[in-house]
Amino acid sequence: VTEPDFLTMARTAYDTVAHSYADLARDLLAEIPADRAVLGLFAELVSGPVVDIGCGPGRISGYLKRLGVDVSGVDLSPEMVAVARREHPDVRFEVGSMLDLDLPDGALGGALAWYSVIHVPWEEHPAVFAEFHRVLAPGGLLLMAFQVGDEVRRYEQGYGHDILLDVYRLNPDRVLGQLAEAGFEPHTRLERQPADPKWEKTPQAYLIVRKSGEPGQPSQT
C-alpha cells in the first residue's frame, strides 16, 4: 500500500528538525499556563493507559508521566522517537501512524493528539477520528490541541532547516461535529489568544471529548 504523501512529508520534515525542535520546545510548557491547566485536567479525568499520538520529542508524554499518568508515545518520525527515548527513558515510545495504530480495539483509557492532527489534510480527519475512537475504551477521553483557523500554510523553513511541511488550521466547531459523527461526546472546550507572537500567530484551541458508552461496557458498533 502506497503511503499518503502527507505522511511522507511529515515524517521527512520531523526527521530533519527533530533535535532542533526538541531544544526549542523543551521549556514551552513553563511559559504557557493554559497548556499545563488542560493537561492537568486531562490527567485528573483519565483512567487507564494513555497514548500520546504524534508525541514528537516526548515533552508532553514526560509531563503527563510526572502527573502520574500511565502514558506511552507514538510518532511517525523515527528521529523524534529516538529523541523522546533519550530524553524520557521512563516512558515507552514507538514509531507508528495515527491512521493505523498498533493497538487492539478499546485498549486505551485516553488518547492525546497535541498539535499532531495539524499535519493531516481536513478530508482525512474522519478516518483519523475513527481510529482514535477504535482504540479507546467506552468512556475513554481524547484531548486535542491545535491552531484555530480555516487555512493551510506550507512551511519551507523550520527550526533552522529547509523542510516542506503543511500545517492545517482547524475550526473547533467543525472538529467537534466530526468527532460527534465518529462517536464522541463533548466534555471541555477552551480557546486562548496567542501566548507569544514569536511562535504563535493564531488563537489556540483545546478539546476534550469522551467516547460514547459507559466505562466497562462493550463498544457499540
Describe every region a protein language model picked out.
Residues A195-T221:
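Core SAM-dependent methyltransferase catalytic element
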Residues V167-A182:
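Short alpha-helix
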Residues G140-F146:
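Conserved beta-strand signature within the Rossmann-like core of class I S-adenosyl-L-methionine
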Residues P126-P138:
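A short glycine-rich, Lys/Arg-flanked "PGG" loop and its adjoining helix->strand segment in the class I
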Residues L99-A111:
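A short acidic, Gly/Pro-enriched loop at the edge of an enzyme's catalytic core
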Residues T2-V46, D150:
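Conserved class I S-adenosyl-L-methionine
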Residues V148-D166:
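Short, glycine-/aromatic-enriched active-site segment of Class I SAM-dependent methyltransferases
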Residues V51-I53, P57-D100:
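Class I SAM-dependent methyltransferase SAM/SAH-binding core
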